[in-house]
Amino acid sequence: MDGIKYAVFTEKSIRLLGNNQYTSNVESGSTRTEIKHWIELFFGVKVVAMNSHRLPGKGRRMGPIMRHTMHYRRMIITLQPGYSIPPLIEKRT
């Protein structure tokens, strides 16, 4: 299982960081239990709650044919007070 695809940085997700809530896109086939276990194991934190929603795919025109991109799942992960996840941003030099 690949788990988390990447962290999401939107206006809403940055606002939620103040509430100790982290937003990320995850594999669409994974369950909440798998993601919770993976986050607690990998980052060493305690997850209090998880909210998820599935975002629809967008339409893409490929010549005369209209196709759709794959949908994906976004999770909002709430941690216990005192725990935090380090930033998932790589520095470019």
Curated annotation (Swiss-Prot):
GO terms for biological process: translation. Part of the 50S ribosomal subunit. Its main location: plastid. This is Large ribosomal subunit protein uL23cz/uL23cy. GO terms for molecular function: rRNA binding; structural constituent of ribosome. The keyword RNA-binding applies. Binds to 23S rRNA. The lineage of its organism: Eukaryota, Viridiplantae, Streptophyta, Embryophyta, Tracheophyta. It holds the Pfam family Ribosomal_L23. Belongs to the universal ribosomal protein uL23 family. The keyword Chloroplast applies. GO terms for cellular component: chloroplast; ribonucleoprotein complex; ribosome. It comes from the Eukaryota.
